[in-house]
């Protein structure tokens, strides 16, 4: 994948997650703030938890940072896979957001 294709894909992911956070806040009356600066999206939850998603274009990776650690993902044409064999991006983000919000949240891209 070219760098341009990668950046467009990341833009779609960040847009989707940002919209989802706004929807969760409105529909479930949760205090979640989504802050975007370029290719970095930070979700701030009521308890002060920060979840940061950003891209590393040179490595063609999407990174997720939370209290539980930092995770790197590569796109295989269908999904973002953990480079160390852990849960995929969607499952991992669902888990960290659910833990931070205190209610089950499901990420869909």
UniProtKB/Swiss-Prot annotation:
Q: Which residues form a coiled coil?
A: none
Kindly state a single biological-process term from the GO annotations of this entry: iron-sulfur cluster assembly
Q: Which SMART domains match?
A: Frataxin_Cyay (SM01219)
Q: Does the keyword Iron apply?
A: yes
Lineage: superkingdom: Bacteria
Pfam families assigned: Frataxin_Cyay (PF01491)
Query: Iron as a keyword?
Result: yes
Database matches in InterPro entries: CyaY, Frataxin/CyaY, Frataxin/CyaY_sf, Frataxin_CS
An annotated Gene Ontology molecular function: ferric iron binding
GO terms for cellular component: cytoplasm
Q: Which cysteines are joined by disulfide bonds?
A: none
This protein's UniProt keywords = Iron, Metal-binding
Q: What is known about what this protein does? A: Involved in iron-sulfur (Fe-S) cluster assembly. May act as a regulator of Fe-S biogenesis.
* Family note: Belongs to the frataxin family.
Q: What is this protein called?
A: Iron-sulfur cluster assembly protein CyaY
- Look up and give the organism this protein is from: Bordetella avium (strain 197N)
Lineage here is: Bacteria, Pseudomonadati, Pseudomonadota, Betaproteobacteria, Burkholderiales
